[in-house]
Amino acid sequence: MYFIIADDLTGATDTGIQFQKRGIATTVLVEPPKEALPCPGERTALSVNASSRELCPQEARDRTQEVMQRVVLRDQDTLFKKVDSLMRGNPVEELEAALEAAGRRIALAAPSFPRMGRTVDGGVLRLPDGSAKDLLALFRERAHMAVCHIPLARLRTEGAGLAADLVRREAPLLCLIDAVTEEDLSLAAEIGQALDTPPVYCGSAALAEALPVRGEQPDVPCRPAARRVLVVTGSQKKETAAQVRRLEAVCGLHKVLLDSERLLHEPAPEEISRAAQRLTELLRQ
C-alpha cells in the first residue's frame, strides 16, 4: 500500500495521480479523516488532504499526527509526505510528525521539481525567477531531530550506496537530498530502496513519480470519462488561468464565475446560491 499525506488538496491529487497512472488503484480523501481508515489492498494508494498548510507549526504537527493515527501502516507499505515544492506551509514540522507517528528511523526529503524549474543544490532551493531559499538552514532551524544533507556530487557518485552511511547515523534522522534532474530524484528513491528499514519519502509529485512501484503497469488506459466533469478553481495564478483557457478551447468548457465583490459586500449566500443553481442546470444537461 502507498499512503500519501499532503497539506492541501492540490498536493493530495497531483501526488496520487503519479500512482494511479502506473496501475495503482488510488483514492483521494478531500478532507482529513475523522475515524479509522480501513486497511486497503496491497496494490492501492490512499492520498489524504490534511488541510494543514495554513495552520501554525504546532497545529500542523498535531494535524499530521492525527491523520497518521487513522491508518495502520505495515513495514512493507510506502509512506510519502507530500510537501509543496516552494516549501510553503510547515514542511519540517509535518515531516517530523509523520516520521515519529510511523515509528520509522529515516526521512528522505527531496523536494525538487525539475520540470517546473525548482531544484535543490547545495541545500538551497532555486526557483526560475532567480530567487532562492536555504532549505538546509530551514531544516536545522525548525527540526527537533537530527538533520543531514546529501550534496549533489555524492548523490551522483555514490547513489544507493549512501544508504549504508545513513543507517549508521543518529536516528530519527531527516535527510535533505539535492536534486537538479529527474534522474537525481530516481537516485534519491534508490537510496530509500536500499535502506534496511523503510523510510518516509518526502517531496513533490516529481519524487512520487520517481519512486519504483511494485507490479507497475505503464500506460494504463484511463477509464471512460464521466458524462459531466466539474472543475473548481479559486487560484489567482496565471498558470491556472491559462489552464482554464485551454479547457475552454479544447473541451467547450462552460464557466460559472463567483463574483468576489458580491461575496465581500453583499450577502454571500445569495451569490453562492446563484452559482450553485447555474451549476446544477449545466450538470443536468
State what each model feature region is.
Residues 1-3, 25-29, 44, 56-60, ...:
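Cap/lid and interdomain-hinge subdomains that line or gate substrate/regulatory clefts
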Residues 124-275:
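Conserved, well-structured core segments that form the ligand-binding/active-site neighborhood
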